[in-house]
Amino acid sequence: MTDQLITLIWIIIKIVLILVPLLVAVAFITLAERKVIGYMQSRVGPNRVGFRGLAQPIADIFKLLLKEVIIPTASSRYLYLIAPILSLVPALAAWAVIPFAQGWMLANVNAGLLFLFAMTSLGVYGILVAGWASNSKYAFFGALRSAAQVVSYEIPMGFALVGVLLAAGTMNLQGIVLRQSGGLWHWFWLPLLPLFVTYWITAVAETNRAPFDVAEGESEIVAGFHVEYAGVTFALFFLAEYANMVLVSAIATVIFLGGWLSPFQGIPGLESLFAWVPGIVWFVLKLSLFIFTYFWMRATFPRYRYDQIMRLCWKVLIPVTLVWIIILALAIEFHWTHWL
């Protein structure tokens, strides 16, 4: 009994050690986004709260927590309140299998890749429930758009993950990272470049971020599925969006950029020079690169029309991933794998 209690306490400690830094990071990612986009648009960004605006996320948190939660009269009360939780929980649960460094993970699951794909697909249910329960036509339109978009883009994303599975020969995320040992040119981003690009486009679409944010098109459907939400409930949707953004960036880091592995492996001189850098530092740096591309895309691209988004998925991404999977399967079958 004592051993079971110690194991349970240790698991809880590990969960806290994962979730607390994640939630703090999400808060400051919102500030980083506003600052980066501000500089891209020749603005300063938030600079009033604290030194150079560094306390802005804290002010935003208090503002959201102190606002009243107003439940629409004709809404389905319980579904309305459950919807934000349905969006947030999968985004947090998926972190259980993400390896931050060698052995640094909550659960070393052999079907980790499958678990991640399942978790990233569940968030849409919260959006659907929110659109239905709000009893608002704008919220419902936004929810339907989001459902169609996420279900469509799950197909090319799934094909991209199948390509990684073929190349690595395992669904264990730690095994996938170790399969990429050897340096920058051994990571899967290069031999699986079309799948890498496809994964990243689908990741942006799955998280409903610009330029794929038609689910909350302010100019068309007044913020979409969370138009009737305020205060804490809106904050949970906001948190879920950014937690998903960090999650898909972490997945891309693990399956395409070698996770915690140093980019200087196999390079004489540089490998020993940077040998002191912990693996988790490389992991965070790679993840930050993907987060930056989210900001860059939001500042650069206009929102696509709904038909353009669907056409990109069904007529471009799905055929590209299918062709590359066939090429990869043939290469493995005939042992032309020197490029992997």
From Swiss-Prot:
InterPro entries tied to this protein: NADH_UbQ_OxRdtase_su1/FPO, NADH_UbQ_OxRdtase_su1_CS
Source organism of the structure: Coxiella burnetii (strain CbuG_Q212) (Coxiella burnetii (strain Q212))
Gene: nuoH
Gene Ontology molecular functions: NADH dehydrogenase activity; oxidoreductase activity, acting on NAD(P)H, quinone or similar compound as acceptor; quinone binding
Similarity comment text for this entry: Belongs to the complex I subunit 1 family.
BP-aspect Gene Ontology terms: aerobic respiration
Subunit and partners: NDH-1 is composed of 14 different subunits. Subunits NuoA, H, J, K, L, M, N constitute the membrane sector of the complex.
Translocase among keywords: yes
Protein name as it appears in the record: NADH-quinone oxidoreductase subunit H
Transmembrane segment boundaries: 9-29, 81-101, 113-133, 158-178, 184-204, 221-240, 245-264, 273-293, 316-336
Pfam families named among the record's database cross-references: NADHdh (PF00146)
A Gene Ontology cellular-component term: plasma membrane
Keyword terms: Cell inner membrane, Cell membrane, Membrane, NAD, Quinone, Translocase, Transmembrane, Transmembrane helix, Ubiquinone
